[in-house]
C-alpha cells in the first residue's frame, strides 16, 4: 500500500495542522478478522463534530500526532493507522457517542497486555479536546489471542487438582486484614479450612509488613493447610499473596510457596502490573501452582461511567495475561453490580465463545479459541442468606468468598465455615432436585439451619 497522498514524493511534504477526520475517519472501512476492535464512549468538548473526535481517538491511540510530520512519508499510514469506522449515539445522552476504532494487528507486540494497553489507552485519555473518554470493550482477534498463554491452568484442571466437582468452591478472607501475628493468622486459616471451606485468602494489602513477614505467614498457613487436610480428607488451599515491590521478590515468594507444597498463590494484578502478572502466571503454569487474582485498584479505573475503562476490558486482559481466579463483583451484597452486565463479563471469563449482546454490555463477539477459562470470585458483604442467589446466579464454576460472613459467626470461625458449607450444599442439592432457589431460597436455608450451627 502507498503512504498518504500528502506525503508522496511526487507531491512533496506539506507541513501544518489538518483535521484528523481527513485521515482517520473511514466509515467505508470493512474490519478484518485480524483487527483489534475497540468501542470508546466519547464525551467531546462543545462544538466538535463526532467524526473529528472519533478520528482523533483513533489517531492519538495509533500513528497520529497533532501535526503533519515529514517522516509520515517513510512508512505506510494506510497499513498502520487506527481507523474510526463507525459512530453511534448513546441513548439518553445527547453529548456522548460510541466511536468504534479498528487497529491493525502489526501495531502490537505478541503476548504483551502491557504493550496493548500502552498503545490503546496509554495517552489518548489525557487529550484535551475530549471532556471524557471510556473504553467500553475490546475485540481481541484469534490471531492475537493465540500469542498468549492465558490462565496457568483453567477451570477443569483446577477441579481435577482439587478433586472437587458439581458445586461452587468456598473461600474466606482472613480478618482483620492487618495486625495479626503469623501464628494467630495461621490459626484462623486452620479453623476455617477445618470447618469445611476449600480456600482461605490473604487480603490484598497483606504483603510483608513488620507485624507479619511473608515467610512466617507462608509457614504457618502451610501448617494449617496440611493439618486441616489430614482431618477432613479434602484438598485445601490458602491464597498466599506473592505480590511484592519487584518481580524478583514476587517470584522468590512463589518459589517458596511451591517448595512448601501448597496449591495456590495470589497476585494483585493491577497494582502489581501486567508484566509482573504475566511473569507470575508463566511461573505458576511451569510449576503446578494455581493463581488467584485480586483486582485491587480497579474502581480507580472503572467506576466512573463516562471516563476510564469498563471492568469487562480488564477481565479480558486478565484472561490473556493469566489467572485462574479473579474477583468479579457479587450482584448481591455490599458491592452490588448490575446483574446482566456482571454476568456478561463473567461469561467472558469462563466461556470459550461469547456472542455480541449489547443488553449485557458485550459490544463484540469474542472467540477465545480454547484459551483456559477463569473462575469468577464473588466476594465482599455476602453471607449465608445470600447463598441461594449466589448459587443460582454464578452456577458451579465460581468461587464464593466470605469474610465477615464466616468469621463473624457468633460461635467462631469454624462454626462459621460449617454454616457456609452446609448452606452451599443445601442450595446445590435443592437446585439439583428442581427447586426454585429464587423463590424458595429462604426456606432452604432455614431447613439447613436445623442441622447446622
From Swiss-Prot:
Keywords: Acetylation, Calvin cycle, Carbon dioxide fixation, Chloroplast, Disulfide bond, Lyase, Magnesium, Metal-binding, Methylation, Monooxygenase, Oxidoreductase, Photorespiration, Photosynthesis, Plastid. The modification N-acetylproline is found at residue 3. Coiled coil: none annotated. The keyword Cell division does not apply. One of its GO terms (biological process) is photorespiration. The disulfide bond which can form in the large chain dimeric partners within the hexadecamer appears to be associated with oxidative stress and protein turnover. The modification N6,N6,N6-trimethyllysine is found at residue 14. This is Ribulose bisphosphate carboxylase large chain. It comes from Galium parisiense (Wall bedstraw). The gene is rbcL.
Amino acid at each position: 500500500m502507498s503512504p498518504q497522498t500528502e506525503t508522496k514524493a511526487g507531491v512533496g511534504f506539506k507541513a501544518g495542522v489538518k483535521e484528523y477526520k481527513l485521515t482517520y475517519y473511514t466509515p467505508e472501512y470493512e474490519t478484518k478478522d485480524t483487527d483489534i476492535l475497540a468501542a470508546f464512549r466519547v464525551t467531546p468538548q462543545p462544538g466538535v463534530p463526532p467524526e473529528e473526535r472519533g478520528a482523533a481517538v483513533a489517531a492519538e491511540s495509533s500513528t497520529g500526532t497533532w501535526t503533519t510530520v515529514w517522516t509520515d512519508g517513510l512508512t505506510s499510514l494506510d497499513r498502520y493507522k487506527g481507523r474510526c469506522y463507525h459512530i453511534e449515539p448513546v441513548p439518553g445522552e445527547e453529548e456522548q457517542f460510541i466511536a468504534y476504532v479498528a487497529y491493525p494487528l502489526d501495531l502490537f507486540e505478541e503476548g504483551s497486555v502491557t504493550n496493548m494497553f500502552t498503545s490503546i489507552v496509554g495517552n489518548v485519555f489525557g487529550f484535551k479536546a475530549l471532556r471524557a473518554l471510556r473504553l467500553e470493550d475490546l475485540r481481541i482477534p484469534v490471531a492475537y489471542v493465540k500469542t498468549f498463554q492465558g490462565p496457568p491452568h483453567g477451570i477443569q484442571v483446577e477441579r481435577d487438582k482439587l478433586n472437587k466437582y458439581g458445586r461452587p468452591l468456598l473461600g474466606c478472607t482472613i480478618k482483620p486484614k492487618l495486625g495479626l501475628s503469623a501464628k494467630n493468622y495461621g490459626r484462623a486459616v486452620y479453623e476455617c479450612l477445618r470447618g469445611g471451606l476449600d480456600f482461605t485468602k490473604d487480603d490484598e494489602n497483606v504483603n510483608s509488613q513488620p507485624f507479619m513477614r511473608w515467610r512466617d505467614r507462608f509457614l504457618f498457613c502451610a501448617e494449617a493447610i496440611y493439618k486441616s487436610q489430614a482431618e477432613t480428607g479434602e484438598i485445601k488451599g490458602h491464597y498466599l499473596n506473592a505480590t511484592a515491590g519487584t518481580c524478583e521478590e514476587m517470584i522468590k515468594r512463589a518459589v517458596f510457596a511451591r517448595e512448601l507444597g501448597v496449591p495456590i498463590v495470589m497476585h494483585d494484578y493491577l497494582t502489581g502490573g501486567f508484566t509482573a502478572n504475566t511473569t507470575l502466571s508463566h511461573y505458576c503454569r511451569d510449576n503446578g501452582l494455581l493463581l488467584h487474582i485480586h483486582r485491587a485498584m480497579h474502581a480507580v479505573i472503572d467506576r466512573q461511567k463516562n471516563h476510564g475503562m469498563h471492568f469487562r476490558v480488564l477481565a479480558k486482559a486478565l484472561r490473556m495475561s493469566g489467572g485462574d481466579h479473579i474477583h468479579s463483583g457479587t450482584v448481591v451484597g455490599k458491592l452490588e453490580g448490575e446483574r446482566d452486565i456482571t454476568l456478561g463479563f463473567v461469561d467472558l471469563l469462563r466461556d470459550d465463545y461469547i456472542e455480541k449482546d449489547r443488553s449485557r454490555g458485550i459490544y463484540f463477539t469474542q472467540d477465545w479459541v480454547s484459551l483456559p477459562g477463569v473462575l469468577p470470585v464473588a466476594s465482599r458483604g455476602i453471607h449465608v442468606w445470600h447463598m441461594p442467589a449466589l448459587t443460582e446466579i454464578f452456577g458451579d464454576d465460581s468461587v464464593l468468598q466470605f469474610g465477615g460472613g464466616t468469621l463473624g459467626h457468633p460461635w467462631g470461625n469454624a462454626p462459621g465455615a460449617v454454616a457456609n458449607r452446609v448452606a452451599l450444599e443445601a442450595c446445590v442439592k435443592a437446585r439439583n432436585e428442581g427447586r426454585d432457589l429464587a423463590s424458595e431460597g429462604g426456606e432452604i436455608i432455614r431447613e439447613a439451619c436445623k442441622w447446622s450451627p
